[in-house]
């Protein structure tokens, strides 16, 4: 048994991790939040501890007071302010007497330095991993590919906010991603949470922990969508001109989306093991992704 603190537990991915923690009895946990969040605490029957992410010494004190062994960060990192909060959380954990393990807020693909340089939000997350490497803390980044939630909403419950990026389900259209033939990994946040919690019992962590809900090419995904809806979906191949896209996708198509297409093509989302990494599916064969191979049945 270890005591866990989930930072950002009221957000999308963090909420899914909290759900998984609530479903087990081996580990105790608290949720760290900038506010006391009484409604969230009552609804989920969890202990919420308010924390000031600008105060490293206070962070260390809170973690020690609650005898926290493992910190799981699920903070939303989209600005330097958010990134600084996570950096301070790392430093506070490193300065704590009780904390031994840390999970940075990654939950995506196996990004490298080139990705961090190309996409600001990826770079903002990467600094936490660099900071962790300087500490005595054992850490792992969870690599789960794309969130399958976006293909199953609203039929399958999710704590993620709905948004159009690659799909426009009502109009039966999809943005074209590269050649569409390269396999990519997709995992539902519910399953991410289950594997994250299972990993708490591992005697040793690798620096990267891979989770595979399903692996399909983008063409396969579009074909599945067409079979389910009974309509052929045209794939709208990205071009340098936003005028080539349907209206619903013009706002979605951006430099970020083009980068995703380039990264799809290079295999960034294929979740290929590298040195210092492990497939959690192999370590926990009893965990069968709820929305892996059967996700098409839940496509809305």
UniProtKB/Swiss-Prot annotation:
Superkingdom as given in the UniProt entry: Eukaryota
InterPro entries in the cross-refs: NAD(P)-bd_dom_sf, NmrA-like, NmrA/Isoflavone_reductase-like
Gene3D superfamilies with a match to the protein in the record: NAD(P)-binding Rossmann-like Domain, UDP-galactose 4-epimerase, domain 1
MF annotations from Gene Ontology: oxidoreductase activity
Signal peptide feature range: none
Function as written in the Swiss-Prot or TrEMBL entry: Oxidoreductase; part of the gene cluster A that mediates the biosynthesis of botcinic acid and its botcinin derivatives, acetate-derived polyketides that contribute to virulence when combined with the sesquiterpene botrydial. Botcinic acid and its derivatives have been shown to induce chlorosis and necrosis during host plant infection, but also have antifungal activities. Two polyketide synthases, BOA6 and BOA9, are involved in the biosynthesis of botcinins.
Protein name, per record: Oxidoreductase BOA1
Gene that encodes the chain: BOA1
